[in-house]
Amino acid sequence: MSSWLQSIFTSPILNPDTDTTNFINYFDTKYSNEHPNFLTGSYQLAVEKAFQQSKLLIVYMHSPLHVDSDEFCNKIICSASFIEYTNSNFLFWAGSMSDMEAYSLSIQLKTTSFPFLTVFMCQSKNAVQIADRFNGTITGA
């Protein structure tokens, strides 16, 4: 891996369980522990759970360096109405651009701006279809 590519990752490559646990701890500390129920584990595990539970899957890509991330997390993700609606109707997986799995997924999804949310319909344990995607400045709450 080139030194430039290594420099965009702030932590060593870890396993997805550790990455998501670290992200949740980061989110709890920086924003609030009042947020949707973030799934732990890999993105693939989140897809499997969503398929098994017949739920849509929201994937949030977090860029700690993006100017709109703090406002989005504080005003949208941590809002009571978003939390209640999301927990009742979806499963929610989040990843940081500083983690390899989330970064790789963002490339596959052609993420061009942040904040970035994708809603997936999980058609099997390995197949998903994008139901909707939201990127850039997202207003509400």
Predicted segments with their positions:
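Core residues of folded domains in eukaryotic genome-function proteins
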Residues: 52-58, 88-93, 113-118, 130
